[in-house]
Amino acid sequence: MATLLEKTRKITAILQDGVTDLQQELPYNSMTERLANVIDCNACVINTKGELLGYSLPYNTNNDRVDQFFYDRKLPDEYVRAAVRIYDTMANVPVDRPLAIFPEESLSDFPKGVTTLAPIYGSGMRLGTFIMWREDGEFTDDDLVLVELATTVIGVQLSNLKLEQMEENIRKDTMATMAVNTLSYSEMKAVKAIIEELDGEEGHVIASVIADKIGITRSVIVNALRKLESAGVIESRSLGMKGTYLKVLNTGLFDKLAGRNF
């Protein structure tokens, strides 16, 4: 059996290995799996909205409530509201308590089931909650030492995610601004008319119809779309006689156009 020191080293190694994949739908699955293996439990990481960021289930609990959570990738709102009010680690919550991951009706199936919740902080902000549970056997003091270390590691990783998301939002906003600024008045007018024809963020348009509708030439529309596509703001595909398929890749375009007067 691994010693506390060995387990501690396995957790701190996560920071060195860079186990998150921000391109994945659940970017922290690998990290959560490693933590669950070290602490010897089922585990998941949620953000402050209750959205699932990663999970690992080495022990199958046959729990409908938990299964539904992973299917929806979000915990019930009332559970999340209670969880974010926890400011220190809450250990070994029994099955019959509201914050137990086990449904109350499963008390007879998992009489010794316990849940431990630990808040995740980063850069002075609450970023989420680390939830762990076992069917049989409480979390010991040694386990809780590992939990405290794990939440620190998760906090660093979530801070990195938040920073990358901020940088990505700034990049998209800058690209949308630059793309719109390259358009002439007529081209901006054309793009706004095109956006109004789309069904949300994508759809198909017929350039000649829009040109006639707003009183410009078809070439103005073609030039405007070419500029936006080269800036990575939209993508387009010819549909032949049916017109052109368009998809807005950078939704910042909507705000930039809305701020212009025509």
UniProtKB/Swiss-Prot annotation:
Q: What happens when the gene is disrupted?
A: Disruption of the gene in peptide-rich medium and exponentially growing cells significantly increases expression of over 30 genes. Repression of oppD by regulatory BCAAs is completely removed in codY mutant.
- Mind telling me which GO cellular component terms the entry cites? cytoplasm; protein-DNA complex
Any keyword Cytoplasm?
yes
Locate the DNA-binding region by residue range.
Answer: 207-226
Region called GAF domain, residue ranges = 1-159
Summarize induction of expression. Represses its own transcription via a CodY-box in the promoter region.
Activity regulation note? Activity of CodY is modulated by interaction with the branched-chain amino acids (BCAAs) leucine, isoleucine and valine, which are signals of the nutritional status of the cell. Whereas both BCAA and GTP are CodY effectors in B.subtilis, L.lactis CodY responds to the intracellular BCAA concentrations, but not to physiological fluctuations in intracellular GTP.
Functional note:
DNA-binding global transcriptional regulator which is involved in the adaptive response to starvation and acts by directly or indirectly controlling the expression of numerous genes in response to nutrient availability. During rapid exponential growth, CodY is highly active and represses genes whose products allow adaptation to nutrient depletion. Targets include genes involved in amino acid transport and metabolism, but also several genes belonging to other functional categories. Among others, they include major components of the L.lactis proteolytic system such as intracellular peptidases (PepO1, PepN and PepC), the dipeptide transport system (dpp), the oligopeptide transport system (Opp) and the ilv-ald operon for BCAA biosynthesis. Binds to a 15-bp cis-sequence, the CodY-box. Multiple copies of the CodY-box are present in the intergenic regions of some transcriptional units.
What this protein is called in its record is: Global transcriptional regulator CodY
**Which lineage do the record's taxonomy fields give for this organism?**
Bacteria, Bacillati, Bacillota, Bacilli, Lactobacillales
